[in-house]
Amino acid sequence: MATTADFKNGLVLKLDNKLQQIVEFQHVKPGKGPAFVRTKLKDVVSGKVVDKTFNAGVKVETATVDRRDMTYLYNDGTDYVVMDDKNYEQIPLSPELMGDGARFLLENMPVQVSFYEDQPLFVELPVSVELKVKHTDPGLQGDRSTGGTKPATLETGAEVQVPLFIETGNVLKIDTRDGSYLSRVNN
């Protein structure tokens, strides 16, 4: 059990026999009336996000989620295979469980897998990854670091929007949460 004071992003709650992860929360203390906590909860099974408001101090049942450090090994055609770093057990994970971040996976990349009662719930990739540009159109004379963008295909096959000065062969830092370009890595 936890109170609303214990809320933090990533905490998994058990509400209405469903596991819901806190994506966002905000403590609100209005000038008149009692304080409350506004949250955005993501159903860990369906991925649906809902808004829910709790009165401050309310006790809520939390789910005991086991986070394990694992290493992504390979894609066997249908599933993504990861290995537990402690006992070297290999576990296949479905594409639905991997989510959109799967397009940035490289072999031997560290990931965190969250389990509830020995069932994998969700996978967390590193916040940013460094990937090489496999193909992008050449930049034009006069391209500057500010301005437009163009598509670039990365070594994993993912396509992202990058600034015009990026060339094939550059190594880029990419945010795995939204697929956005962060910076060019000096080689």
Curated annotation (Swiss-Prot):
The compartments listed are:
Cytoplasm
Where is it predominantly found? Answer: cytoplasm
Q: Which UniProt keywords apply?
A: Cytoplasm, Elongation factor, Protein biosynthesis
Question: Which molecular-function annotation in GO is an example for this chain?
Answer: translation elongation factor activity
Top-level taxon? Bacteria
Q: Which GO terms describe its biological process?
A: peptide biosynthetic process
Q: In which pathway does it act?
A: Protein biosynthesis; polypeptide chain elongation
Q: Which residues cross the membrane?
A: none
> Cross-referenced Pfam families, in alphabetical order?
EFP, EFP_N, Elong-fact-P_C
Any GO CC annotation of this UniProt entry: cytoplasm
Signal peptide span: none
Function field: Involved in peptide bond synthesis. Stimulates efficient translation and peptide-bond synthesis on native or reconstituted 70S ribosomes in vitro. Probably functions indirectly by altering the affinity of the ribosome for aminoacyl-tRNA, thus increasing their reactivity as acceptors for peptidyl transferase.
Q: Which family does it belong to?
A: Belongs to the elongation factor P family.
**Name assigned to this protein:** Elongation factor P
Organism for this UniProt entry: Corynebacterium kroppenstedtii (strain DSM 44385 / JCM 11950 / CIP 105744 / CCUG 35717)
